[in-house]
């Protein structure tokens, strides 16, 4: 799925924290070869932090 499609879906679901942190989390994940579960966890934590 393209980045723009992901951002559209995150916006539609009102996942603004996840959307804001996406590029940084993905860049770090690629550099450090994070597992998919780690990436999803980091995105979810970004969303939780945004909502608090």
Residue spans of the language-model regions?
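Charged, compositionally biased N-terminal leader segments and the immediate start
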Residues: 1-13, 17
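Interdomain "pre-motor" coupling segment immediately N-terminal to P-loop NTPase/helicase cores
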Residues: 7, 19-52
